[in-house]
Structure formats: C-alpha cells, structure tokens
C-alpha cells in the first residue's frame, strides 16, 4: 500500500490539474533527527521533505541571522551551495522550518542545510509559505503531534536555474499535514512560486 506521503502527492497533482515533471532516477534520502529529505541530484533540490512536529518541538530559541546553509549531503554530485542563492532574486526557503525545531539551538541549526531548502520567491517565502508554517505549528499545539510533508513541484514547462551550480527553481510547492495515529489529513496547501 502506498504511503500517506505518496498518496498525498498523487492526490494533489490530480486535483490541481497540472502536469508534473517527475524524475526519480537520481534520488538520495537524507535521514536527520529533525527531518527526512528525498534529495534530487538532477535538480539540486529536495524532491520532498517530511517530519513529525510535536507541540514540544516549538520553543523559544531564536535563529542567528549570521547562520549560513551548509552542504550536508555526502555525495559528490550534491553540489548546491549557500552561494548559489546569492543575488539570484530567490530566498533560501526552508522546507522543514527552523522554528519547528526551536526547542534547541542545535536542532534549529541543523535545519540550515542544503537538503532542506529550495529557491522561493521573497513574496512566497515571507507570505503564504510562512502562513503554512504558522498554521502547522498551531495544528501541532492543538493535536499534540502532526506529520508534515513539503514538496517542491516542477511543471511541464521551462524551468529557471540559479547559481553557479544551476539549481532548478520549483514552479510551485505543496504542503500537507496529517495526524500520525490514523493518517487523517487535516490541511493541504498548493502554492505557486511567484
């Protein structure tokens, strides 16, 4: 039986009526305590990131503005770097938000990794995407624990590339939240990267 993650991705694509470009030939999975990332070496971007968010994960730790995103993938083909985003017009958009790991400085710091970011427009990153992050934290407080999935989406059309290493810019993002005890989906968002 397909996992809830795969069922959510398939359902969102069908409901949106978009044509989704999917290449799974070069995926590697990164397992971290804070999140899991299925990283696409051909796009130099996560294909999906998922994590459990508990009410106890949300704390008072503040992010340090001097933190840079580190290249954390032990594969010579994973060449995306913090500098690829510099002067590109795109933000380094967290998929698993730093604030979801604000119970500890070390946990928050570990979200600053290339396996956990994708190019997002400033309007999306500081607007609707931020609202999905806040909504998920509220849901975690209400339900004590939720699971979250964030998926960059490339449409069947021209793709923009940024940086020296040519990172592929997603056309849209999907995020979903569900209850771990019974896989009940409680929230789904589909947002265009503009």
Residue ranges of model-derived segments:
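Bacterial N-terminal signal peptides that target proteins for export
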Residues: 1-10
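Bacterial N-terminal signal peptides
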Residues: 10-19
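A short hydrophobic/aromatic micro-motif that marks alpha-helical segments and, especially, helix-coil
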Residues: 20-21, 109
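Boundary at the C-terminal end of the N-terminal hydrophobic targeting segment
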Residues: 21-27
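Short, His- and charge-rich active-site/binding loops that engage polyanionic ligands
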Residues: 28-91
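Domain-level detector of nuclease and nuclease-like folds
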Residues: 75-194
């Amino acid at each position: 039986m397909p996992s809830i993650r795969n069922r959510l991705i398939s359902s969102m694509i069908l409901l949106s009526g978009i044509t989704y470009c999917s290449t799974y030939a070069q995926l590697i999975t990164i397992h971290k305590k804070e999140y899991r990332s299925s990283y696409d070496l051909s796009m130099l971007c996560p294909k999906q990131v998922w994590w459990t968010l508990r009410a106890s994960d949300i704390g008072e730790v503040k992010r340090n503005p001097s933190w840079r995103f580190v290249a954390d993938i032990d594969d010579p083909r994973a060449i995306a770097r913090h500098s690829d985003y510099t002067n590109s017009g795109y933000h380094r958009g967290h998929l698993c938000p730093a604030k979801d790991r604000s119970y500890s400085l070390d946990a928050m710091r570990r979200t600053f990794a290339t396996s956990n970011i994708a190019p997002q427009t400033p309007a999306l990153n500081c607007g609707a995407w931020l609202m999905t992050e806040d909504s998920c934290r509220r849901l975690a407080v209400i339900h004590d624990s939720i699971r979250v999935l964030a998926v960059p989406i490339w449409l069947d059309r021209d793709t923009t590339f940024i940086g020296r290493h040519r990172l592929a810019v997603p056309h849209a993002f999907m995020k979903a939240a569900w209850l771990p005890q019974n896989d009940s989906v409680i929230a789904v968002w589909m947002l265009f990267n503009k």
